[in-house]
């Protein structure tokens, strides 16, 4: 039921993420045998969303998006513990980056030239956007 609710596109994305975290905490409490952590945080949960809907979602990583926003001098702010605002701002920022990438035909052609029949074609460039964010955050 947790994944069904997470993938319910009729609800706000952060509300779904938060509900998944809460459900994970309940499962940990009930079945965790004293384990301290369930590891179902925003990074893992957005990965599930991206794997299910690769043309709609990006993979969130707080440390990465914070650097990306700073490097691009974006108006979005990311603060530790501000989970809802951080995820919502992350999606807005990456949507902006993705929109810019979609206008760069040279980059799109470079991407397409590298794809094989076994590669996901990434028609909406969400995966490319994740890769660009990763690159910005590291270099």
Name each model-derived stretch.
Residues 5, 19-22, 26, 66-70, ...:
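Charged/polar, solvent-exposed surface patches and flexible loops
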Residues 80-139:
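A basic, often C-terminal nucleic-acid-binding module that engages the phosphate backbone, implemented
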Residues 37-70:
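Catalytic DNA-binding helix-loop module of base-excision-repair DNA glycosylases/AP lyases
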Residues 1-40:
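Helix-hairpin-helix/helix-loop-helix acidic hairpins
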């Amino acid at each position: 039921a947790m994944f069904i609710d997470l993938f319910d596109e009729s609800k706000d994305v952060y509300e779904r993420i938060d509900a998944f975290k809460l459900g994970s905490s309940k499962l940990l409490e009930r079945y965790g045998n004293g384990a301290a952590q369930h590891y179902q945080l925003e990074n893992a949960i957005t990965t599930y969303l991206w794997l299910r809907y690769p043309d709609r979602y990006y993979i969130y990583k707080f440390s990465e998006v914070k650097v990306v926003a700073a490097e691009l001098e974006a108006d979005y702010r990311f603060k530790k513990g501000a989970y809802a605002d951080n995820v919502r701002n992350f999606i807005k920022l990456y949507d902006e980056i993705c929109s810019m990438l979609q206008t760069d035909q040279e980059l799109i052609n470079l991407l397409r030239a590298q794809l094989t029949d076994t590669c996901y074609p990434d028609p909406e460039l969400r995966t490319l956007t994740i890769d660009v964010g990763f690159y910005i955050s590291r270099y």
